[in-house]
A protein has these predicted regions:
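… and, occasionally, acidic/histidine-rich disordered N-termini of signaling adaptors
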Residues: 26-170
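Acidic/polar-enriched heptad-repeat coiled-coil alpha-helices
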Residues: 2-3, 9-10, 16-17, 23-24, ...
């Protein structure tokens, strides 16, 4: 009788352990599914951001109006990129071509690239800027203002490295 009771106790203990293991497994599966769902939402959101980033970059047909012999190699490390290229006609008819590498990779870099393109477009649309130096100076001022930087050590060091070329297309 004592041996049967011991066996019954061990069986109940094993059943309890089995239920706990199954409960832990179910929890792990729910957490895995939740993480997978969150990852999908984040990836979908970043893909949508990629479409926005592509929309602000010059299109091939736009580039063809300014340039005849060119190529574009744009390969983001992540879905979105901190790199950008830009081309426009200045008020005096010359062409400005920019290639930039913004601080940060992925989403932070993409934010900076969209900021850079937007500010460049604003400078050309609303200010009389016709030299590469003036354009870069104005862009620098506007990036500092947009990021609320004051030149202090504790400021973020966000920005961009840019090559800017102004050419006479005639």
């Amino acid at each position: 009788v004592a041996q049967n009771q011991e066996i019954l106790r061990q069986k109940e203990e094993i059943e309890a352990q089995k239920e706990e293991i199954e409960s832990q497994r179910d929890l792990a599966e729910r957490q895995r599914d939740q993480i997978a769902g969150q990852q999908k939402q984040i990836t979908d959101s970043i893909r949508y951001a990629s479409r926005i980033q592509s929309a602000v970059m010059p299109r091939t047909d736009t580039l063809a109006t300014f340039l005849t012999d060119y190529f574009i190699y744009f390969q983001p490390k992540n879905i979105v990129s901190g790199d950008f290229f830009w081309v426009t006609r200045l008020n005096d008819g010359r062409i400005a071509i920019a290639v930039a590498d913004c601080t940060g990779h992925g989403v932070p870099g993409a934010f900076m690239s969209i900021l850079g393109i937007t500010l460049l477009k604003e400078i050309i649309a609303y200010q009389q800027v016709n030299t590469a130096g003036d354009l870069l100076d104005k862009l620098r001022q506007m990036v500092i203002a947009a990021l609320n930087q004051s030149g202090q050590v504790q400021d973020s060091h966000d920005g961009m490295d840019m090559g800017l070329l102004v050419v006479d297309a005639t």
